[in-house]
Amino acid sequence: MKLNLRTTVNQSFRQVFRLFTKELFLKLSPPFPKVKLLRFDGSEKQDRVVVELDFIFFKQKWESVIVEKKESKDEIFFVDEGVKLPFFLKKWRHTHRIIKNGDKADIVDDIEFETPFRLFDFLFYPILYFQFAYRKPIYKKVFSETSS
């Protein structure tokens, strides 16, 4: 199943990419489930991100690896794929696109996921949508200054 969210921010796309850091990753984490960052290498090919999700009564580890990164005059993107996923996910591929939009930038979360059962994909979609919609005001706040 696919999910796509776009947020326009008031900074250049190159500056936005430079600020895709561990600190931003932590700010983007929603209140639930609580996220403990175990490893964050960055956004370059072969970098890894490992988190522990705390669902109060149980915890799940999630590990993703950056499998692709490309840059052009109008866009920078990188792709993380889940290599160790929580039990409720069978497949995860998240393309982080930062696209030039005049003197601003569009941040696009382009996600492909599968749960163990097709029906669960439809049940999981709204949960995932709200988890990523949570990021929109954070992106806008973090990138509210004009580019330097």
Q: Where are the regions a protein language model picked out?
A:
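Intrinsic-disorder/low-complexity, polar/charged segments enriched in Ser/Thr/Lys/Arg/Asp/Glu/Gln
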Residues: 2-8, 48, 61, 75, ...
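Hydrophobic-ligand binding "helix-grip"
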Residues: 55-102
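Short, highly charged C-terminal tails/helix-capping segments
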Residues: 37-38, 141-148
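Short, well-structured hydrophobic secondary-structure segments
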Residues: 40-60
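Hydrophobic ligand-binding cavity/cleft-lining segments
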Residues: 1-46
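Beta-strand/loop substructures that line and gate deep hydrophobic ligand-binding cavities in soluble
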Residues: 83-130
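A non-catalytic, amphipathic alpha-helix used as a structural packing/dimerization or gating element
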Residues: 130-138
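Hydrophobic pocket/interface hotspot
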Residues: 15-20, 66, 78, 98, ...
